[in-house]
A protein has these predicted regions:
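Metal-dependent phosphodiesterase/phospholipase catalytic core, i.e.
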Residues: 1-92, 142-144
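C-terminal active-site rim and adjoining tail of enzyme catalytic domains
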Residues: 94-211
Length: 211
């Protein structure tokens, strides 16, 4: 495998990593606790979700010794989530919602924690719109994201107080330092970023204890 230059159409020597490559890298990371895998399939092809999960499990079963970290399988629709079952305790599931860039009227409708509560999941994730612009709407997408996230955080805390069960909320994808600081202050449990070293430095400077 390799990439082709879009202009010259010449194939490069860069190797496209496979899932096996990812797993081989992951098992070498001594401090790794979670590996988040996003499974994507159209709703009308949701039957592919459990098929992909089984392929993942088959690959993981070949690893010796077994990995010490857990897998979080993230799915963007409830229909796909309903099909996911695993007897392995190291596989966890998460409803994954990316907010639309505009058109949000009912903020509660876009929260993720209620879905996690319904499926008894330990994780939920909420994504910032990839293509967002304040000109598309009267509302700033970042302000909308924070509002929905704040609702989720309140639901998470209320759920914990009522049941002692905790739902970890993951925010994605953020590379802006100010936004990352804001997310940490709000109380998210994890942040997906393309700049992990920067994220770690920010968290340490803010007094967070990292494993």
């Amino acid at each position: 495998h390799g990439y082709k230059d879009k202009i010259t159409n010449v194939k490069t020597n860069f190797k496209i990593p496979t899932f096996q490559d990812l797993i081989e890298w992951a098992v070498k990371q001594n401090k790794l606790k979670l590996l988040i895998l996003k499974l994507r399939a159209p709703i009308d092809e949701k039957y592919l979700i459990p098929v992909m999960l089984e392929e993942i499990r088959r690959t993981v079963r070949k690893i010796s010794p077994p990995p010490l970290f857990q897998f979080v399988i993230s799915v963007p629709n409830k229909e796909g989530l309903e099909l996911l079952r695993s007897p392995d305790s190291n596989f966890l599931f998460s409803f994954d919602r990316e907010l639309p860039p505009s058109g949000i009227v009912n903020y509660h409708r876009f929260t993720t924690v209620p879905v996690a509560m319904n499926f008894k999941n330990k994780f939920s994730s909420i994504g910032f719109p990839r293509y967002s612009s304040a000109t598309e709407s009267n509302l700033d997408p970042w302000a909308v994201y924070k509002f929905v996230l704040t609702l989720d955080l309140k639901l998470r805390d209320n759920y914990k107080n009522a049941t002692s069960n905790y739902i970890n909320i993951i925010s994605w994808t953020f590379n802006d330092e100010k936004k990352i600081k804001c997310l940490i202050n709000l109380g998210v449990d994890g942040i997906v970023t393309d700049k992990p070293k920067m994220l770690r430095e920010i968290a340490l400077n803010m007094g967070k204890v990292l494993d």
